[in-house]
């Protein structure tokens, strides 16, 4: 057991409660949920939508407090990327500006969306 158990426990309980509230909808926070099918496993990228059929959409217009991307493989959830929307927006913008994320890219159903291909590894490791 950590010698800082008495300090770590309240800290852990606080954030355990935050996640529990988000997952049980026992909060006034909104979560935007997107799902990536199998292709992410091959490419290592997720698609972040900015425009749909010529109209601003997705991360550009969301009012959600949290942005969730569910990663599925053969119909089974493999993981979930969950970030505060403001942090997701900032990270994606920086990755685009630095040429790490590809933008603009067509995607989504019928390639009706325009957005960014964002490398998952860089998204999760990126500081800034």
Describe each region flagged by the PLM.
Residues 1-7, 25, 54-55, 72-128:
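Non-catalytic C-terminal interaction segments of nucleic acid-processing enzymes
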Residues 4, 8-20:
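Nuclease catalytic cores
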Residues 19-22, 56-58:
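Short, flexible, glycine/charge-rich loop motifs used to bind or transfer phosphoryl groups or to couple energy/partner
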Residues 22-39:
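Conserved catalytic cores of phosphodiester-cleaving nucleases, focusing on short active-site segments
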Residues 28, 56, 63-67, 77-78:
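Short, surface-exposed beta-edge/turn micro-motifs
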Residues 33, 69-70:
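Hydrophobic side chains in beta-strands
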Residues 37-61:
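Mg2+/Mn2+-dependent nuclease catalytic core
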